[in-house]
Amino acid sequence: MKNSEKRGRKHKRQDASSAENAGGEVKEASANEASLPQSPEPVSASEANPSPSRRSRGRGKKRRLNNESEAGNQRTSSPERSRSRLHHSDTKNGDCSNGMIVSTTTESIPAAPSWETVVKVVPSMDAVVKVFCVHTEPNFSLPWQRKRQYSSGSSGFIIGGRRVLTNAHSVEHHTQVKLKKRGSDTKYLATVLAIGTECDIALLTVTDDEFWEGVSPVEFGDLPALQDAVTVVGYPIGGDTISVTSGVVSRMEILSYVHGSTELLGLQIDAAINSGNSGGPAFNDKGKCVGIAFQSLKHEDAENIGYVIPTPVIVHFIQDYEKHDKYTGFPVLGIEWQKMENPDLRKSMGMESHQKGVRIRRIEPTAPESQVLKPSDIILSFDGVNIANDGTVPFRHGERIGFSYLISQKYTGDSALVKVLRNKEILEFNIKLAIHKRLIPAHISGKPPSYFIVAGFVFTTVSVPYLRSEYGKEYEFDAPVKLLEKHLHAMAQSVDEQLVVVSQVLVSDINIGYEEIVNTQVVAFNGKPVKNLKGLAGMVENCEDEYMKFNLDYDQIVVLDTKTAKEATLDILTTHCIPSAMSDDLKTEERN
């Protein structure tokens, strides 16, 4: 792509706390919490009158998505990938819209739950609670600030050990979480014990003993079969009391989890999952929980398609927390692989007619398996289970599933036996499994974003939340092409590698001529490669050369007088009411 093209942000669309992202009730947080659905928070002056447009170098738009995940990646039967939309049944980060999801086609009314099924579910319904959360999200575009707080409502349910399960996106960036039991007028303060972003599950508890009185925990059932009846219970939009919808299991496969930006086992059901249902349990006909409602599909040709987190994923999350006293995540095999369905391809790789498997294309440099596996190895089996040429393994009678399911059943730090074919020789390796280290992480949790400012240049690291903050929900089409390429294909070469960019330039006399530099990667400083933001901040702070030279992407350079630039920084910070030239984590690390 030509260097003469400008890079930058587009005009931001009005987001209103991203209420459109996935339904649910959203209201401004206040001391007086109204129980009725209210309007999304108003547009701020900056949102209503965006700054001058900065043209992007993104891909051409093909469709509009309401969420950070594409329906085409869900492997559903959607005939038109360009029009389908996946939604949290609550909303992004728990933010909920107070509007119903409307389809252009006439939706059929789901059948009412049978009396026998309802009777069996009734004892478990008392364990279903309503979750009230106040969120305060970081401002990734202005990392020294936080966004205006907002509140959301979703569902949850009580399990053993005085704990409550709900969705991770329902309590992400929480500042306060309260729970209310069925038939109660009291809201109890809750503590978040763990948040699993990949699996979209959060674990809560309540210290008040009164909350646990007179309620029995929900019991988990086995993985349901296709066409098994399910009843979804929760507190969706449209009322304040508990709601029950019913349907059947219509599909079971590896799904893209919208919030987690990962792929795990999921159930597709035809029971209605509406805004506010997030975190609510799905019961079988015996009154046992077989899943957690978490997202739905919006498509003009789709009706009543909801998705449920199944019990194997839930149990993995709970056992992971109990085993490590924290959530460590779902391990992955750090490879990219290719199907071996073509017979000529198999012969060229030295495979016998009876051998099946998948070819390794690339290996994550930070993954433990990079020490033993090599590109073009053929993975024949994982932990004794043979892998087919299309990458599937036997699941249940008459069913097959992607072999990533086998990996997701493991825990971080577990070992797995991998059999590979290399140069017509069969080899076996014991591999220690670990979580995925992404160059551009899907989530930044537990701390505000890092930043560093000198001479008005705002340096920060790129993450998916940052891209979404800069370019909106359609960042995959509007962000600069080079950032998107790194997001989709780049692999971190070390565990501490980060993608550092000039986010923006706060205009001052010292940076005349550099004002249009926006979201451009910093490649080197004074001839030394920039590995991460901490390293860049350290080099700038300790620079004693006459000039500071920043090498940027697209072969751009920035040269500043070192003494003048450092002196001008304080005035720029004062002008823009920025409390510090760097985030607290960089200060702490530098002192250490």
Curated annotation (Swiss-Prot):
Entries under Pfam families matching the protein: PDZ_2 (PF13180), PDZ_3 (PF17815), Trypsin_2 (PF13365)
Give the EC number(s) under which this enzyme is classified.
3.4.21.-
In the record, biological process GO terms are: proteolysis
Q: Which domain of life is it from?
A: Eukaryota
Residue ranges annotated as compositionally biased, kind Basic residues, are: 54-64
What keywords were assigned to this record? Hydrolase, Nucleus, Protease, Serine protease
Q: Which GO terms describe its molecular function?
A: serine-type endopeptidase activity; serine-type peptidase activity
Residue spans of biased composition, Basic and acidic residues class: 78-93
The record, for SUPFAM superfamilies, names:
PDZ domain-like (SSF50156), Trypsin-like serine proteases (SSF50494)
Where does the record place the region Serine protease?
141-318
Task: Describe the function of this protein.
Answer: Serine protease that degrades the two-component response regulator ARR4. Regulates ARR4 stability by targeting ARR4 in the nucleus for degradation. Acts upstream of ARR4 and regulates the activity of ARR4 in cytokinin and light-signaling pathways. ARR4 mediates the cross-talk between light and cytokinin signaling through modulation of the activity of phytochrome B.
Q: Which family does it belong to?
A: Belongs to the peptidase S1C family.
Protein's name in the database: Protease Do-like 9
Q: Which gene encodes it?
A: DEGP9
